Amino acid sequence: SKINNRRSNNSISKRRNMKQKLEEYFDRLWPINRSLTGNGVRKSLEILSEIVEFNITEVPSGTVCFDWTVPPEWNIVEGWVKDSSGKTIIDFKEHNLHILGYSEPVKGKFTYDELQPHLYTLPEQPELIPYLTSYYKRRWGFCMSHIEFEKLDKAETYEVFIDSTLDDNGSMTIAEATIKGTTDETILLSTYICHPSMANNELSGPLVASFIYNQLKTIPNLRYTYKFIFVPETIGSIYYLSKNGENLKENLTAGFVITCIGDPGVFTYKKSRRGDALPDRAAEIILSQTESNFNIIDFFPSGSDERQFCSPGFNLPVGSLIRTMYGKYPEYHTSADNKDFISFEAME
């Protein structure tokens, strides 16, 4: 009885420890401005490399992967809008969603009518800041709550400043980690690292993947070889497939894209395009044994990086593990996808 109690206490203490570590890493990663490329991704991977032994690759901007091209590297120092009295109306330093991702630099004075086409809001969620990007079309812009937008004075002239760079000689950063098994049969865990301060839609995936890596590292004589990739969504997995796709076709037994895994909703598993591959069967069995309530949905071609892995040229056995599906919760791609929305118990 004493031994059982000790085991139970150890288990509680380990869980508390895991939850605490998840939260500590979350707090460090949260303020960093990540995008498809740039120093925010490097800084985030540097922090996560305390948990995961990464092999990091810098892919030069302009690299062609299939019919896609790696974009210029984007970095930003500051961005703001002030009125004629010098009062700051929008400030990137207050919330990094305030900037349209990949905004080109700008400095100048604009009337309300000139500025208005560069402002983005969510009239149906008026208190929230939207998350928007323009990776492949040069433009600049700011995102703000519709409430603040409605307060703008139409007779004002506004001073606008964005200190950003788009570097054709820059690079895109991707990270890979491998835990070698006794066979070359491979299980892939893929997550993306490319969004600014959003909790569920950005940080839940890399955090959960990092701690899965950490747990697997402690298990001796694993049969499968585990590959973990942390890549900018879409372009990162397309680049990865351009380099490793043939090898994956040969050795990949199962793969999972981990995304939106931090909210308190029930598990959702999105099947691979094959529909009856090993990960599809395994997910169904495990969820039915461990969860009283869950969703299993068929593959559809939009979504996250499963669309690249399951694309016709590869058709790999890769499904997606999610809690509440992207686009199905109102906080998605807004400033409400924050620490209050997620649950560290759910991530554990």
Question: Predicted segment positions?
Answer:
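Short, Lys/Arg-enriched N-terminal segments with co-localized hydrophobic residues
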Residues: 2-17
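N-terminal hydrophobic/helix-forming segments and targeting peptides
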Residues: 14-348
